[in-house]
Swiss-Prot record:
It catalyses: L-threonine + NAD(+) = (2S)-2-amino-3-oxobutanoate + NADH + H(+). This is L-threonine 3-dehydrogenase. Gene3D superfamilies: Medium-chain alcohol dehydrogenases, catalytic domain, NAD(P)-binding Rossmann-like Domain. Catalyzes the NAD(+)-dependent oxidation of L-threonine to 2-amino-3-ketobutyrate. The active site is at 40 (charge relay system), 43 (charge relay system).
Length: 341
């Protein structure tokens, strides 16, 4: 089968002929229709320090996808041939304390599709049936292929009550932009998103952000005054992993504010903890998606009218994968989709 593999321990990704994956008794075999390129895939492509420590070589990568069930393990119930599915990319152990308590998203033994095991940049993928999610008929393949990152946005945004609240999002990558759309859809008042990438900020405006602020040109506190905000943001969603962005968030949070952190800093990050203490801030770390509460909310949000389609800006055939990775690496894109049909 065709597959994109991290074939060598150097920058790049390679289109290869790989063996079709072998299915177990509790697995599904999925014929991939579309995949999307994630920021994690770009880290792997660029072979940065994290990738060098994490990714086995050679390995098929990728974890954002939609496909069709073409074979079913003999112990699997609830799926049939032809079901359209995406899937949770975090494979959990099932026996740790959190798994047994129903908090599978907090499994300490998580294995990542396309990170620790064979991924979805291939014509076929095998995953445990437990991890598969049936896609409703009224949700397109394009949208289904980005459910993984959309789930990060939904999990982060819905960590706290948003109705009538003022929300600051730091980092206008695709996940931050989708989070802005979610916040507006569920009833936040002002949703302000910050970045220095004007292309991405314009996407955020199209997706419903009240204000998309280029912090290299505008002062965030001036924007707050312009919006009539006198007491700071009620909810903060940190999506960038950039220390200066997090510092700006702490400076502008209201007393009693709540912060959800999805962005991963590149190293240790010093902050002024006195601001956290005296403001009484709540800070919550976010990793992945809640299984499977986030997935049901994703589908329901789209079915109730949330439009995240503007975040998809580029489509390529799999043979043109290099153009897709170039587009994603340029910073002048939203989500990039590769078609395997």
């Amino acid at each position: 089968m065709k597959a994109l593999s991290k074939l060598k321990a150097e920058k790049g990704i390679w289109l290869v002929d790989a063996p079709k994956p072998v299915m177990g008794h509790n697995d599904l075999l999925i014929k991939i229709k579309k995949t999307a390129i994630c920021g994690t895939d770009m880290h792997i492509y660029n072979w940065d320090e994290w990738s060098q420590k994490t990714i086995p070589v050679p390995m098929v990568v990728g974890h954002e996808y939609v496909g069709e069930v073409v074979d079913i393990g003999q112990e699997v119930r609830g799926f049939k041939i032809g079901d359209r599915v995406s899937g949770e990319g975090h494979i959990t152990c099932g026996h740790c304390r959190n798994c047994r308590a129903g908090r599978t998203h907090l499994c300490r033994n998580t294995s990542g599709v396309g990170v620790n095991r064979e991924g979805s940049f291939a014509e076929y993928l095998v995953i445990p049936a437990f991890n598969a999610f049936k896609i409703p008929d009224d949700i397109s393949d394009d949208l289904a292929s980005i459910f993984d990152p959309f789930g990060n946005a939904v999990h982060t945004a819905l960590s706290f009550d948003l109705v009538g609240e003022d929300v600051l999002i730091t980092g206008a990558g695709p996940i931050g932009i989708m989070a802005a759309a979610v916040c507006r859809h569920v009833g936040a008042r002002h949703v302000v998103i910050t970045d220095v990438n004007e292309y991405r900020l314009e996407l955020a405006r199209k997706m419903g952000a009240t204000r998309a602020v280029n912090v290299s040109k505008e002062n965030l506190k001036d924007v707050m005054k312009e919006l009539g905000m006198t007491e700071g943001f009620d909810v903060g969603l940190e999506m960038s992993g950039v220390p200066s962005a997090f510092h700006a968030m702490l400076d502008t949070m209201n007393h009693g504010g709540k912060v959800a952190m999805l962005g991963i800093p590149s190293g240790e990050m010093a902050i002024d903890w006195s601001k956290v203490i005296f403001k009484g801030l709540v800070i919550k770390g976010i990793y992945g998606r809640e299984m499977f509460e986030t997935w049901y909310k994703m589908a329901s949000l789209i079915q109730s009218g949330l439009d995240i389609s503007p975040i998809i800006t580029h489509h390529f055939k799999i043979d043109d994968f290099q153009q897709g990775f170039d587009a994603m690496g340029s910073g002048q894109s939203g989500k990039v989709i590769l078609s395997w049909d």
